[in-house]
């Protein structure tokens, strides 16, 4: 299972964006963004917002990680 918080942090870094930038976009504090980075799971509404501001489909990343045994 992927660590969604780490994936969000990696994408933010890849885009050369700052934590302050993300906090402004999410209308939250920098501390809240750092807490997001530490999460293994995340609220879907928050993930949708993050996906939109980073132009990255984190839902697809999660879906790609699912293995279904037949």
Predicted region positions:
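A short, Lys/Arg-rich alpha-helix, primarily the initiator
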Residues: 1-21
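DNA-binding alpha-helical recognition surfaces that contact promoter or target DNA
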Residues: 10, 24, 35
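Residue-level detection of the helix-turn-helix DNA-binding "recognition helix"
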Residues: 13, 38-39, 52
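Recognition helix of helix-turn-helix/homeodomain-like DNA-binding domains
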Residues: 27-42
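DNA major-groove recognition helix of helix-turn-helix/homeodomain DNA-binding modules
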Residues: 45-61
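Short amphipathic recognition helices of helix-turn-helix/homeodomain-type DNA-binding modules
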Residues: 61-70
């Amino acid at each position: 299972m992927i660590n969604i918080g780490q994936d969000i942090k990696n994408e933010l870094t890849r885009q050369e964006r700052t934590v302050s930038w993300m906090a402004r976009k999410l209308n939250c504090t920098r501390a809240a963004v750092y807490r997001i980075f530490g999460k293994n799971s995340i609220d879907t509404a928050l993930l949708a917002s993050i996906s939109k501001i980073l132009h990255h489909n984190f839902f697809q990343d999660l879906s790609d990680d699912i293995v279904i045994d037949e």
